[in-house]
A protein has these predicted regions:
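Catalytic/RNA-binding core of pseudouridine synthases
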Residues: 2-288
Length: 288
């Protein structure tokens, strides 16, 4: 936590106001809660109203959420514009309405009879998904259309058309490829993936699935500019491979200089709405 104490003088005399607590918290957001939920919990823990965050994470995502309180909220507009790094898992051969595992499955694409080689996938990423690219966000996003959130319009059944936006992909590396089971069988996915990856030896997989219910899965690392949608990358990569694709896991490991590996990262506990440091001590502020 980066914390400061600030005082100010009144216009009448030299009376000093009560010091205002302010600072930044680097929080490891858990899965299943919104960024707004985390902010609300920080307000309760610190007994403060002036709290905000630098860059929304979807409920499915985990990782770095920079939260500012007091005068430090002024810094959030600068922090949100910094580059970000993500670790993600992309499932190929399945499309969803939201481009991630939270959405409903769409009609299946072609079966991945022959999975491309590592060289072919990496060449495609270099040519089409590295540097400055144009990206169309999913309609289930927080982008505003005529003053309304796109996801609100989409949930109301209204037609939403979002324009392509320029983003910059600095790094898009495939760590490994493996086979996993269906969209809903996540436990089976990890087990099967580990077995097949071990057989491959080099972190890649055979060109055919060992079981008809399995689909290819890729673990990737992406460093990108602000405003990049990783689930849109997953969708577009799947389309370029002719298979379709969606995001099944997303973890933000860095926002600017704030990393999930920093010693002062806080763990957020959704049920109790509390925060602890790496030693397990609860973080709060006395009202006095």
């Amino acid at each position: 936590m980066i914390s400061t104490m600030m005082t100010s003088k009144s216009k009448i005399g030299m009376m000093t106001k009560k010091p205002e607590h302010s600072g930044l918290l680097v929080i490891d957001k858990p899965q299943g809660v919104t960024s707004h939920d985390v902010v609300a919990a920080v307000r309760g823990a610190l007994h403060m109203k002036r709290v905000g965050h630098a860059g929304t994470l979807d409920p499915m995502a985990t990782g770095v959420l920079v939260v500012g309180f007091g005068n430090a909220t002024r810094l959030l507009n600068y922090i949100v514009d910094h580059n970000k790094t993500y670790e993600a898992t992309i499932r190929l051969g399945q499309r969803t309405t939201t481009d991630d595992a939270e959405g409903e499955l769409l009609p299946a694409g072609e079966r991945a009879v022959n999975f491309p080689s590592r060289q072919a996938v990496e060449q495609l990423i270099t040519e089409r998904f590295t540097g400055r690219i144009e990206q169309v966000p999913n309609v289930y996003s927080a982008i505003k259309v005529n003053g309304q959130r796109a996801y609100d319009l989409a949930r109301e059944g209204k037609d939403v058309e979002l324009k392509a936006r320029p983003v910059t992909i600095e790094e898009f590396n495939v760590r490994q490829a493996r086979y996993g089971y269906t969209h809903s069988d996540r436990a089976g996915t990890e087990l099967a993936g580990a077995v097949v990856a071990e057989r491959a030896g080099d972190g890649w997989i055979a060109d055919t699935a060992p079981h008809e219910d399995m689909q290819p899965v890729m673990d990737v690392t992406v460093t990108c500019s602000a405003g990049t949608y990783i689930r849109a990358l997953a969708r577009d990569l799947g389309e370029e491979l002719g298979l379709g694709g969606h995001l099944t896991m997303l973890r933000r490991t860095r926002v600017g200089r704030f990393s999930v590996n920093m010693p002062n990262v806080m763990s957020a506990h959704a049920e109790s709405k509390t925060f602890t440091n790496r030693e397990g001590m609860e973080v709060t502020r006395n009202r006095a």
